[in-house]
From Swiss-Prot:
Purpose: Is probably involved in a pathway contributing to genomic integrity.
Regions crossing the membrane: 173-193
Gene name of the record: IRC22
Signal peptide range in chain numbering: 1-21
GO cellular component: endoplasmic reticulum membrane
Intervals, Cytoplasmic compartment: 194-227
Topology versus the membrane: Single-pass type I membrane protein
Subcellular location as annotated: Endoplasmic reticulum membrane
Protein name (database record): Increased recombination centers protein 22
Amino acid sequence: MKLFQLTLFLLVNAFLALASSESVDVESSSNETAVEEPSTIDFDVGYNILEHLDTDLSRGVEFSMQEVATFNYSFTNNEKVNVSVVGVAGSVISTPDGYQVANITEQPIGPVPIGVNETANFQAGVQLILPEGNFYMLPVLNVMKDGEPLRVGIRPLLITVNPPPLSFFNPSFLSVQILLGLLIAGATYAFITFDKSETKRKPAKNAKPVAVDQSWLPDTYKKPEKP
């Protein structure tokens, strides 16, 4: 029994010693390897939609097909150097499957210079040439910092695209109106024609009896005259 306890004690000590040596090796190797931290940018970018100023963007926005969404950007530069916004682009992602279905056409802006700790506002319109459904719009701003181009992603916007409202002069709507007009005209004509035929069939009121010449009839067939 004592031999077993002694053997177990030696095994535990050996395991602890091995673990401590491994941890020391890992520490020393991690100290020797210099890890470069990724560079960060310090911008504060927000936006609203001019066509839906009273809408809570966190809940999504509804648009009609072919409608233009005007993004009104607010850009605050918290960097230690001046920057300039030179363009806007982005992409459109379908939901919930997450496929990219369209690109936001890149369009130049300004350039809009923004100094240190300054805020600038600018606008960019996007025409929604999309099918009916739900999508995420992912705007991207093109920024110049120290002569180097940067692409700054902004929080996505959930949008719902609905069919366009039916115009009174829409060809399909006009065809429906013409069809309804023809049906109403046909029904009116049939009613007027039927009413005229019924009027012709009615006997004349207060018609006076017409005297019939019975002189040529035999006496047997003659009606006796009323006294």
